[in-house]
UniProtKB/Swiss-Prot annotation:
It comes from the Bacteria. Residues 101-364 form the Prephenate/arogenate dehydrogenase domain. Keywords: Amino-acid biosynthesis, Aromatic amino acid biosynthesis, Cytoplasm, Isomerase, Multifunctional enzyme, NAD, Oxidoreductase, Tyrosine biosynthesis. In the C-terminal section; belongs to the prephenate/arogenate dehydrogenase family. GO terms for cellular component: cytoplasm. This is T-protein. The gene is tyrA. It is found in: Cytoplasm. Pathway: Amino-acid biosynthesis; L-tyrosine biosynthesis; (4-hydroxyphenyl)pyruvate from prephenate (NAD(+) route): step 1/1; Metabolic intermediate biosynthesis; prephenate biosynthesis; prephenate from chorismate: step 1/1. One of its GO terms (molecular function) is NAD+ binding. It catalyses: chorismate = prephenate; prephenate + NAD(+) = 3-(4-hydroxyphenyl)pyruvate + CO2 + NADH. Its EC number is 5.4.99.5, 1.3.1.12. GO terms for biological process: chorismate metabolic process; tyrosine biosynthetic process.
Length: 377
């Protein structure tokens, strides 16, 4: 037998095993769907962290005993779990508050508003949408609403909340999904005498599942009246993080405004350079390709949204100005050929990150491996 024939036979066996794997995958997903039905019936969150950790630890040990890479098995299982979380959505979720007969989402045809509309419908709540062309009939849309959720662009949020004022009754819950919280929360408390809740989903509308996602909670008024909504969101798999509006907005200056500005500036700078993007990609290491992907991803989205996030408040500009100063400071190391100064600064930053440095190194290594797997050619 020639080596090509031997290779063909081995590949044929591998193909056969792959087909068996597909059947096993299908069986596992079917079992997961049954789990989803049970969770739906009993109102259990789709994400159970303790179960996930215990299962992964057990499978890693079993893999090592079998002489298989534990990381390989964990990678496969995590991909399965991600698929499983998305599949569990199709069975819907338990209705936490059966006394809620009408929820109105202002801006519910938008991306994020539409996402919450789908999840709330899947949880058994009747949903009505008030869109920008509907204000002439706002009274009828908002009549008898139990909950009103505002999900509009940042620059329209305060105006929209003000326009709702004539239609709000004390028994209603008024909430918003805006990525800034201090001014919207204050405006809701001003126009409404009933329950008020500020929410900030820390994810985009393109997620496949809310499992492991974070939703920030900023209390407004009468929290006992909206605990059911927070519990509902947790059943979807999300984690609720509680903070106050001022602290939230301060943190968002760094999490959103500074990061988005830096990404925008990097993209703007690259676009002005005498380079060919295709050539950069062909020569890229996995980490640089991932960085390029993060930059390019920004420019595939809504420019108005990012303009609003970056320009939202004066604190953002002040912090961005300090970034400019830090760039100038860092540049002096190289202008002065100050190698030791650079090394000293490097070590100071490493000390600031502390143990997170090693944690981020491990996490980024996994991301880079996945990014390299997706590389074409």
């Amino acid at each position: 037998m020639s080596f090509m024939e031997a290779l063909k036979d081995l590949r044929s066996e591998i193909d056969s095993l792959d087909r068996e794997l597909i059947q096993l995958f299908a069986k596992r997903l079917e079992l997961v769907s049954q789990v989803g039905k049970v969770k739906h019936q009993h109102g259990l969150p789709i994400y159970a962290p303790e179960r996930e950790i215990a299962m992964l630890q057990a499978r890693r040990l079993e893999a090592e005993k079998a002489g298989i890479s534990a990381d390989l098995i964990e990678d496969v299982l995590r991909r399965f779990m991600r698929e499983s979380y998305a599949n569990e959505n199709q069975f819907g979720f338990k209705t936490i508050n059966s006394d809620i007969h009408k929820i109105v989402i202002v801006g519910g045809y938008g991306k994020l508003g539409g996402l919450f509309a789908r999840y709330l419908r899947a949880s058994g709540y009747p949903i009505s949408i008030l869109d920008r062309e509907d204000w002439a009939v706002a009274e009828s849309i908002l009549a008898n609403a139990d909950v009103v959720i505002v999900s509009v662009p940042i620059n329209l949020t305060l105006e929209t909340i003000e326009r709702l004022k004539p239609y709000l009754t004390e028994n209603m819950l008024l909430a918003d999904l805006t990525s800034v919280k201090r001014e919207p929360l204050a405006k809701m408390l001003e126009v409404h005498t009933g329950a008020v809740l500020g929410l900030h989903p820390m994810f985009g509308a393109d997620i496949a599942s809310m499992a492991k996602q974070v939703v920030v909670r900023c209390d407004g008024r009468f929290p006992e009246r909206y605990e059911w909504l927070l519990e509902q969101i947790q059943i979807w798999g999300a984690k609720i993080y509680q903070t106050n509006a001022t602290e939230h907005d301060h943190n968002m200056t760094y999490i959103q405004a500074l990061r988005h500005f830096s990404t925008f500036a990097n993209g703007l700078h690259l676009s002005k350079q005498p380079i060919n993007l295709a050539n950069l990609l062909a020569l890229s290491s996995p980490i640089y390709r991932l960085e390029l992907a993060m930059i390019g991803r920004l420019f595939a989205q809504d420019a108005e949204l990012y303009a609003d996030i970056i320009m939202d408040k004066s604190e953002n500009l002040a912090v961005i100005e300090t970034l400019k100063q830090t760039y100038d400071e860092a540049l002096t190391f190289f202008e002065n050929n100050d190698r030791q100064g650079f090394i000293d600064a490097f070590h100071k930053v490493r000390d600031w990150f502390g143990d997170y440095s090693e944690q981020f190194l491990k996490e980024s290594r996994q991301l880079l491996q996945q990014a390299n797997d997706l590389k074409q050619g």
